[in-house]
């Protein structure tokens, strides 16, 4: 496995909470849009937004990889995008990483209300290659793609 580190940010290590999830069985394309939406938000605000998207009360805007994503009437105008979706599986894993980073920050004694999503990113993970047997001795490739999620929350 290749060496991996968090990005070097100009933040004191005692003032941030970090979390990473490796090889999550989630689409990188969905994760990209989820990460872009909550980057820079307050942690409580981000969790509330993700909860509204899970309940389909508000659509998650799609800036990229939006081919076929229809326009949604419940997207806020602040996003300046019309197309969106409800990527529930991606939100589930991002929320888990966000909660882990929040718990790590609380363990360092940081104030929960002042925490902000300083860095969040999604990267391609490993590809699990499988073959599905078919009729007449043939086989079809089946690729399970995974993704990595990294979150850093810091006190503002």
From Swiss-Prot:
Pfam families assigned to the protein according to its UniProt record, in alphabetical order: Ribosomal_L22
Record-linked InterPro entries: Ribosomal_uL22 (IPR001063), Ribosomal_uL22_CS (IPR018260), Ribosomal_uL22_euk/arc (IPR005721), Ribosomal_uL22_sf (IPR036394)
UniProt KW keywords: Ribonucleoprotein, Ribosomal protein, RNA-binding, rRNA-binding
Entry annotated with the keyword Ribonucleoprotein: yes
Acetylation found in the keyword field: no
Gene Ontology terms: biological process: cytoplasmic translation
GO molecular function: rRNA binding; structural constituent of ribosome
GO CC, alphabetical: cytosolic large ribosomal subunit
Family in the record: Belongs to the universal ribosomal protein uL22 family.
Function: This protein binds specifically to 23S rRNA. It makes multiple contacts with different domains of the 23S rRNA in the assembled 50S subunit and ribosome.
Subunit annotation: Part of the 50S ribosomal subunit.
NCBIfam families: PRK04223.1, uL22_arch_euk
The protein's name: Large ribosomal subunit protein uL22
Organism: Metallosphaera sedula (strain ATCC 51363 / DSM 5348 / JCM 9185 / NBRC 15509 / TH2)
């Amino acid at each position: 496995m290749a060496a991996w580190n968090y990005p070097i940010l100009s933040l004191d290590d005692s003032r941030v909470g970090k979390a990473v999830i490796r090889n999550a069985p989630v689409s990188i394309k969905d994760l990209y849009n989820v990460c872009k939406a909550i980057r820079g938000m307050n942690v409580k605000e981000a969790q509330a937004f993700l909860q509204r998207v899970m309940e389909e009360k508000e659509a998650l805007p799609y800036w990229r990889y939006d081919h076929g994503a229809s326009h949604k009437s419940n997207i806020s105008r602040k996003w300046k995008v019309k197309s969106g979706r409800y990527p529930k599986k991606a939100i589930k894993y991002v929320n888990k990483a966000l909660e882990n980073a929040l718990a790590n920050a609380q363990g360092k004694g940081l104030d929960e209300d002042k925490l902000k999503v300083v860095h969040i990113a999604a990267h391609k993970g490993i590809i699990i290659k499988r073959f599905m047997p078919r009729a007449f001795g043939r086989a079809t490739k089946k690729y399970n793609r995974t993704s990595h999620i990294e979150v850093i929350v810091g006190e503002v």
